[in-house]
Every structure is written in C-alpha cells, then in structure tokens.
Amino acid sequence: MNRITVAIIVALLIGLGGIAVWTSLNTEKFDVNAYDTTKVIAADNNNGQIADHYRGKEGASIILVEYADLQCPGCATMMPKISKLYKEYGDRIGFVFRSYPIQGHPNARSASAAIESANKQGFFWETLEALYDNRIDWINVSDTEKRTNVYADIFSKATDGKGDVEKFKKDLNDSNIQKKIDFDKTLGGKKDKVTATPTIMINGEMLDIEHASDIAKLIEDKINEYLEKDGQKTGPAETEE
C-alpha cells in the first residue's frame, strides 16, 4: 500500500468517524497480544526503549491505567480526580499514564511529545500537570516554533528552572519519543479497544465513565471493589489530625 493510498483511506476513515483506525496505518506493526496492558510495560524496541509512566507502590496488585489526549478537556479535568485518589490510595494502587492523541486534536501529539521530552530529564509528572493547567496557552497554537516555545516555557516553570530547555526542545523530535506515542496508541486502540479519551481501566476492566454521574466515585468504588477482592483494606488511608 503506497502513501497516497494510505492518505486517501485515512481521509475517508476520518470522514466516517473512524479515528481509532489511524493507529494501524501510522505505526510499525507489532504483536499487541505480546503485552499485558494491565501491568507496567517495560522498555523495549517497540516503544522506543521508553517504559510505561508509572507512579505508586512497586508491584501493586491494583493498577489504574489512563489513556489520555492532552488536548482533551475531559482529560484535563480527570487529572485532579486521579491525583486525589492516588494520594489517598497510593500505598495500595499504581497509576499508569499512556498517550492516546486523537486525530481531530492537532496539538495533542506534540503535547504528548512534550511530556516524553520532559521525561528524559525526569520531569514527566510535573510537566504533564503543567500542560493540563496551562492548556489554554497551547491548544490553539498552530505555528510549530511558537508552540515549541510555549511548551518550553511551561516545562521551565514546571521544573522551577531546573530543566534543560534547549535539550527539551531538541528531544521533542526524538524518533524514539514518536515511537513511544505510536506504541501507546496502538496498544490502546488494538488491545484495549479505546475509542475515546479519557479511558480509565482498572486491572484491565474498562470503566463506563461516559454515563457516570460522579466519575471520581465510580473510580473509587471500583478501586475498593478490587481491594476487597485482594483482601486489602478498603477506603482512603487514614491521616493524622
């Protein structure tokens, strides 16, 4: 299949709402079934030698996975909910973040590259939260150079000036970072059947957040359900007065 044919097919698919199919045309082929998406995925050649972004207790039996598009407003409002739950349950659960940039969001992929670039300096989570907090500054910037400078400014502030801004800019175009983004999206689309963002999965079970009246409660209830099954204490950790 030549590039022109692929471009035509992609255009038709987008017109029909087939956004999720883009992944299979845009990435190198690999066996998605070789990966257990309910666990933390290690670095290998398919993901550009970039492991899953994980925070929480090592070896946690309950893993919450989020597939997110940084340009998605729902993902921006989801992050504080997950951060709160992580603080309350972090000694018993783990949290994995995977990128799933939607085709209709023109700056989503570059934002994913920004957090991966920050990750190379150890500032993934700080930059992720900063990009969400300042999304109004970059979501509509179409000029590549201007957008890069906005990302760099957000990165610098998120790291309190400790990050190397020039390295950050250079790494935005790292081929391994692009490979990691494609890898995450392919796993989401082909293995976990992600069709929208944010998508939340707990131990492989996809939560129906679209129809939930209280998303935070839905996630917390599911966490407690799995904690109970695992014989662990349910509810938030007790805090000292």
List each language-model region with its residue ranges.
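C-terminal cap of thioredoxin/glutaredoxin-like
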Residues: 1-30, 153-241
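Ser/Thr/Pro/Gly-rich low-complexity linker/stalk segments immediately outside membranes or between
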Residues: 25-41
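A short beta-strand-turn-helix
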Residues: 45-62, 87
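Short secondary-structure boundary/capping elements
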Residues: 45-47, 77, 180
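A generic local structural motif
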Residues: 49-53, 81-82, 185-187
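Short clusters of hydrophobic/aromatic residues that line enzyme substrate/ligand-binding pockets
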Residues: 54-55, 138, 172
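Residue-level detector of conserved, well-ordered beta-strand and adjacent loop positions
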Residues: 56, 65, 208
